[in-house]
From Swiss-Prot:
A zinc finger (GRF-type) spans 39-81. Zn(2+) 2 binds at C124, C127, H139, H142. Zn(2+) 3 binds at C378, C381, H391, C398. It comes from Mus musculus. It is found in: Cytoplasm; Nucleus, Nucleolus. Zn(2+) 5 binds at C409, C412, H422, C429. Residues 393-445 form the DHHC domain. A zinc finger (CCHC-type) spans 441-458. rRNA N6-methyltransferase that specifically methylates the adenine in position 4220 of 28S rRNA. N6-methylation of adenine(4220) in 28S rRNA is required for translation. Belongs to the ZCCHC4 family. One of its GO terms (cellular component) is cytoplasm. This is rRNA N(6)-adenosine-methyltransferase ZCCHC4. Interacts with components of the ASC-1 complex TRIP4, ASCC1, ASCC2 and ASCC3. Interact with AHCYL1 and AHCYL2. Interact with YTHDC2.
């Protein structure tokens, strides 16, 4: 999954996305024992408006997956009391928004479909559905594809049209070049199982590769797109919302994921995730830590110090935010391309190149990047870098993030982009036509003009973030209701400041 380039360019300076651009943050509930209300996409997240570091007094619940209320119009004030009639109507609405076929029905239909002769295997492009003979009359006027082969069934991402709504799915799929590289790299690194979170095309590539002689890897796809339910059996796909750790098919699906992660005491498995870039980093980090905790449950005591290997695929300018929550992660120079997005394809120079990178806790010296695509090994950094990424003797690192050769600024004491110059007014490097310090510049948290939000001393550090996760882990052991536990995690504000617990006790009076 990915997001449109026009959004990415505007986000590069901030290092966060989606609601944050409009001054909205994920918040902790005033009452930690209250479960989050449900929308069609599972438990909602709690948000609060922030203006120059000051939180509005009234928080609200909104959908975790959809950033546009046209796609999911759920809205509820945190302190709002709903009547039984409204709660009942909401439950009915949530049920109506679910897919027309259950997971069990999809599996039953799939098993029947593959038994049909080739001439009777049809796919409705209009409804995005595999058709059985009994369905033909109902879909007679629709656009159909006939003679669906076994090979086509193995590549559903090529049968299904991408969900390209920018603010909801932003479903851009790995290009074959990147997909084959990732699958080959995972095999070279010796992994036998891959948990693909929001990476359907990699899931397909691994399954196709496993059917040959090259690799015996297995894959489990977790994805919010219900259309994949009709192409996979129980052990290959779970419908899942990565922003709130919600399994749409309940405990049975959760157990599938748990068994997959804990097989062989958790050895030989890696998680590869490709979240929508418009999503907030904090909820994703909380979800991934829950998957890590699930994996750790299956480990022996001798392996308790080990980390679940992860490939998190995201734009390079989210580096500081990701490393805040996962300090052991590093960013690789490899540029990940997307098939159905012209600006995410491999280019020959600088800004034509994809901004998408791999963040991982796998040691970078173990990861070989293809020399034929312009990568070389830096003996000083002990990792592969892009050809233009030159080693800086002052920084003692290959510093480029975007594929261009960066220049060292002695005043800033770091390397900067070649298009930037040092501004004496701002005392930092920036684009030549930037606006100097003013009301629109500075920190979104504390209002100071000498730094951005991502570098604010008041924002939670990785230590604080991990401590907060531990706090919610403690609550998880105390509480038994899984949906309630998910609400606790999903309503977490990781960037708490020194006033954190006092903010929780503030009374809510008005909303501006």
């Amino acid at each position: 999954m990915a997001a449109p380039m026009d959004c990415l360019e505007s986000l590069e300076g901030d290092g966060d996305a989606g609601r944050r651009a409009s001054g909205v943050e994920v918040a902790l509930p005033s009452n930690p024992t209250a479960p989050a209300p449900l929308c069609p996409h599972g438990p909602t997240l709690l948000f609060v408006k922030v203006n120059q570091g000051k939180e509005e007094t009234r928080k609200f619940y909104a959908c975790s997956a959809c950033r546009d209320r046209k796609d999911c119009n759920f809205f509820q004030w945190e302190d709002e009391k709903l009547s039984e009639a409204r709660l009942a109507a909401r439950e009915i609405h949530n049920q109506k928004c679910q897919p027309p076929l259950s997971r069990a029905q999809c599996i039953e239909r799939y098993l029947s479909f593959i038994q049909l002769p080739l001439a009777q295997r049809k796919f409705c492009q209009s409804c995005q559905q595999l058709l059985l003979p009994a369905d033909w009359r109902e879909h007679g006027t629709h656009q159909l594809s006939a003679d669906i082969s076994v090979a086509q069934l193995g590549r559903p991402s090529q049968l299904l049209y991408p969900l390209e709504n920018k603010k909801t799915h932003a479903q851009y799929l790995f290009a074959d070049r990147s997909c084959q590289f990732l699958a080959g790299l995972l095999a070279t690194l010796g992994f036998s199982r891959v948990l693909c979170v929001g990476a359907p095309r990699l899931h397909e590539q691994i399954r196709l590769t496993a059917s040959g002689e090259r690799s015996g890897m297995r894959s489990l796809l977790l994805d919010i797109d219900f259309r994949y339910s009709q192409f996979y059996l129980e052990g290959s796909f779970c419908r899942y919302n990565m922003f709130n750790h919600h399994f749409f098919d309940g405990k049975a699906a959760l157990e599938v994921c748990k068994e997959f992660l804990q097989e062989e005491e958790g050895k030989g498995v890696i998680m590869v995730t490709d979240p929508p870039f418009g999503g907030l980093v904090e909820p994703l980090a909380i979800t991934f830590k829950k998957l890590i905790a699930m994996w750790k449950e299956g480990q022996s005591q001798d392996d308790s110090h080990k980390e679940l290997p992860i490939f998190w695929i995201f734009p390079y300018f989210f580096e500081s935010r990701i490393c805040q929550f996962f300090p052991s992660f590093c960013m690789l120079d490899y540029q990940v391309d997307y098939d159905n997005h012209a600006l995410y394809k491999h280019g020959k120079t600088g800004r034509k190149q994809s901004p998408v990178r791999i963040f991982t806790n796998v040691p970078p010296n173990k990861i070989i990047l293809p020399s034929e695509e312009g990568y070389r090994f830096c003996s000083l950094c002990q990792r592969y870098v892009s050809r233009e990424n030159q080693h800086c003797v002052h920084c003692n690192s290959c510093t480029s993030k975007d594929g261009r050769k960066w220049s060292h600024c002695f005043l800033c004491k770091k390397c900067v982009k070649p298009s930037w110059i040092h501004c004496n007014t701002c005392n930092r490097c920036a684009l030549p036509d930037h606006s100097c310090l003013g009301p629109k510049d500075g920190c979104f948290i504390c209002g100071a003009l000498d730094h951005k939000r991502s570098n604010c001393p008041n924002i939670g550090t990785s230590w604080r973030a991990n401590k907060l996760v531990e706090f919610f882990g403690f609550l998880e052991k105390r509480l038994l209701m899984s949906s309630f536990l998910g609400a606790i995690y999903r309503s977490t504000k990781l960037s708490e400041d020194s006033e954190f617990f006092r903010v929780l006790n503030r009374s809510s009076h008005h909303y501006v």
